[in-house]
């Protein structure tokens, strides 16, 4: 609760930046993307300044990995495209802001909620694949399950799976970006957006958590790792 209180204003600012920024980018064609990019980097800088030294490696790792991932997915693989055919400068810091917001939400989720998310998503993914509208979905869903299996930070991945889907639905509805109906290289189909698109965000977070596991023992960034770390310390103390 202390962490939520400390960053409550930042969380609200992140939500406003994402929701308002995408709206401005779409409807203020001349300078909207420039204005939103400047805003996103300012909010990122504010988050960086307010974060302690233990949190900053995760924010930096998220920024670098997200930038590389965006370049590959949109420019090389071409599974989606932004409205101007570029990677907007607000996208890399936007990933960091969404990642941080996800960690704050994940901290408040009850135990095993990740499996509830997985169970609710499964029939929808299966239905869209069965009718041929989103045959990419099962592959992405398997990627999501792999993230749940590979790391103890399961609540974070479940949070990002849902949070990113909400953002994807909003962004594609506005027209900020569009997913291609035929997935290059794989010959699969995809809805706009794919229901399990959040799996890409989960992979990003898995890489961030894996690279900065020691720093992420802070409860503000990785509640699952923090709980595991605290339980281990308590067990060791009881044996002394």
Where are these regions (language model features)?
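Aromatic-rich, lipid-facing transmembrane alpha helices and their immediate juxtamembrane interface loops
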Residues: 1-240
């Amino acid at each position: 609760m202390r962490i939520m209180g400390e960053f409550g204003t930042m969380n609200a600012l992140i939500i406003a930046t994402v929701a308002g920024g995408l709206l401005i980018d779409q409807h203020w064609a001349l300078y909207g993307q420039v204005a939103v990019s400047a805003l996103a980097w300012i909010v990122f800088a504010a988050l960086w300044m307010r974060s302690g030294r233990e949190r900053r490696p995760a924010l930096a790792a998220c920024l670098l990995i997200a930038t590389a991932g965006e370049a590959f997915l949109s420019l090389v693989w071409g599974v989606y495209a932004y409205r101007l055919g570029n990677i907007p400068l607000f996208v890399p810091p936007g990933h960091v802001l969404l990642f941080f917001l996800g960690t704050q939400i994940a901290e408040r989720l009850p135990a095993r909620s990740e499996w509830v998310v997985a169970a609710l998503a499964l029939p929808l993914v299966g239905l869209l694949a069965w009718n041929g509208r989103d045959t990419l979905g099962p592959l992405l869903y398997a990627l999501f399950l792999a993230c749940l299996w590979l790391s103890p930070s399961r609540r974070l991945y479940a949070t990002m799976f849902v949070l990113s889907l909400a953002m994807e639905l909003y962004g594609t509805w506005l027209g900020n970006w569009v997913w291609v109906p035929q997935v290059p290289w794989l010959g699969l189909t995809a809805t706009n957006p794919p229901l399990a698109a959040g799996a890409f965000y989960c992979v990003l977070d898995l890489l961030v958590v894996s690279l900065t596991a020691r720093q992420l023992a802070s409860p503000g960034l990785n509640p699952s790792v923090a709980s595991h770390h605290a339980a281990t310390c308590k067990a060791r103390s009881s044996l002394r």
